[in-house]
Amino acid sequence: DSRQFEGLPQSLRDVFKRSLLILRTQIDNRGAIIAANDSDIVRFGKDTYSYMWGRDGAFVVAALAKAGYSHICTKYFNFCADILAEEGYLFQHYNPDGSLASNWHAWLVDGKEILPIQEDSTALTLWALWIYYQSLNDVEFIRPLYNNLIKKAADFLVSYRDTQTLLPLPSYDLWEERYAV
């Protein structure tokens, strides 16, 4: 859309278009937005970063919504609705096919069972859906997501709080090193 580029120098237009192309190479056609399609760590780590993290996907899809790429956004949100746990949260990360990915988060901390999640992934998915709505005003797409994504995730986020402080309960941090608030 030429409106996106009004008044911008050609060098910025080129960077914008190149950025969109690079983003698209990391997006599975079923909706998963992959952190990185690389194999650098396979040799030593026996794993890749070819996973969908809800946080990363939310930031990417928010930018794509602002750029007007609704078709990619809708696939991502449908993907999230499909993988959302029955209780309303996203796990740490998923394979592009929607299956739960290998996980290095413990399910037990100090002998107590915990959810191996990064709570912000669930919250940021709802935030990105709000950005999508603000950018594209596509309420017809959002309406069917109300019960199986929006309400379930919001109910989880409201319930996943300390009853005394009302702060969120602990979850794993951005770098997956600490389990805390």
Where are these regions (language model features)?
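Acidic/polar, glycine-enriched structural segments that form the non-catalytic walls/loops
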Residues: 1-49, 70, 81-86, 139-141
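Residues in flexible loops and secondary-structure boundaries
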Residues: 24, 31, 41-42, 98, ...
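Short loop/turn segments at secondary-structure transitions that flank enzyme active sites
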Residues: 25, 29, 86, 96, ...
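C-terminal ends of transmembrane alpha-helices
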Residues: 29-33, 156-169
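Short clusters of hydrophobic/aromatic residues that line enzyme substrate/ligand-binding pockets
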Residues: 33-34, 90, 100, 168
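Active-site-adjacent structural elements in folded domains
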Residues: 36-48, 110-112, 167-181
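Aromatic-rich carbohydrate-recognition surfaces in CAZymes
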Residues: 49-161
